[in-house]
């Protein structure tokens, strides 16, 4: 998986390991080092995973770039950086891992997206939300095209989750405001997302593909 160093990512790793998976993290400081904003680095990381571990049965993309910019301030470099990490990197990794999955007639691809795709909370999230929309479209078309090979492609869309990173850009009042809009009146924690990912990687989700699980406390009722 990618993005295993953050609060949500590390919770996903722990959840997968506790479910019996052997987890390999692709990240700047992961078990396999990579700069996901650079295509060559991403492809090299995929090759290293296959060389060192032989196969990938479940691929989770949890890494994300959060560069903030509203329309008036957005520049090409910022937009391209977000797209490189959030959209292109999972494509190159899926491209590398799916041939083996298809050969074994089994594979799971799980993208971590965001509920902000349906209800954008702030103009400065333009690059981030655009990338999550693109990733959602990719998830659906891959679900259709890879299904005949026994590969499912799904996504988890977390809501505002109480993490150190989220606390740097959200006040206590903002956390409370979002929680007030949720059907479930509690703050979301990283294990909420991790549990959804673990389910999608499990035998219990064998009939699911092309679907998004919203782990957002019922903020977006879909």
Question: What role is predicted for each listed range?
Answer:
Residues 62-67, 217-218:
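Conserved NAD(P)H cofactor-binding loop of Rossmann-fold oxidoreductase domains
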Residues 70-71, 78-83, 178:
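Substrate-binding pocket helix/loop in short-chain dehydrogenase/reductase
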Residues 94, 131, 139:
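Active-site helix of classical SDR
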Residues 99, 144-145, 206:
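Alpha-helical segment proximal to the catalytic Tyr-Lys
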Residues 119, 198, 209-222:
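Short C-terminal tail/terminal secondary-structure segment
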Residues 147-152, 208-210:
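Short, small/polar-rich loop/turn modules that mediate ligand/substrate recognition or access, typified
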Residues 182-193, 204:
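A conserved structural motif in NAD(P)-dependent oxidoreductases
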């Amino acid at each position: 998986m990618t993005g295993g160093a953050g609060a949500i990512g590390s919770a996903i790793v722990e959840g997968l390991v506790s479910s019996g998976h052997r987890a390999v993290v692709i990240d700047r400081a992961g078990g396999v080092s990579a700069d996901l904003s650079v295509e060559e680095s991403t492809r090299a990381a995929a090759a290293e995973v296959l060389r060192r571990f032989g196969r990938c049965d479940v691929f989770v993309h949890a890494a994300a770039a959060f560069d903030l910019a509203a329309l008036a301030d957005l520049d090409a470099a910022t937009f391209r950086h977000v797209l490189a990490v959030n959209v292109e990197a999972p494509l190159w990794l899926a491209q590398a891992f799916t041939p083996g999955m298809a050969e074994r007639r089994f594979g799971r691809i799980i993208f971590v997206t965001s509920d902000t795709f349906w209800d954008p909370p702030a103009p400065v999230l333009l690059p981030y939300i655009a990338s999550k929309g693109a990733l959602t479209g990719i998830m659906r078309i891959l679900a259709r095209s890879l299904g005949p090979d026994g590969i499912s492609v799904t996504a988890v869309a977390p809501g505002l989750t109480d993490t150190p990173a989220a606390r740097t850009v959200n006040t206590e009042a903002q956390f409370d405001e979002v929680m007030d809009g949720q059907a479930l009146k509690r703050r979301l924690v990283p294990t909420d997302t991790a549990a959804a990912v673990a389910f999608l990687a499990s035998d219990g989700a064998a009939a699911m593909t092309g679907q998004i699980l919203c782990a957002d406390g019922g903020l977006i009722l879909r």
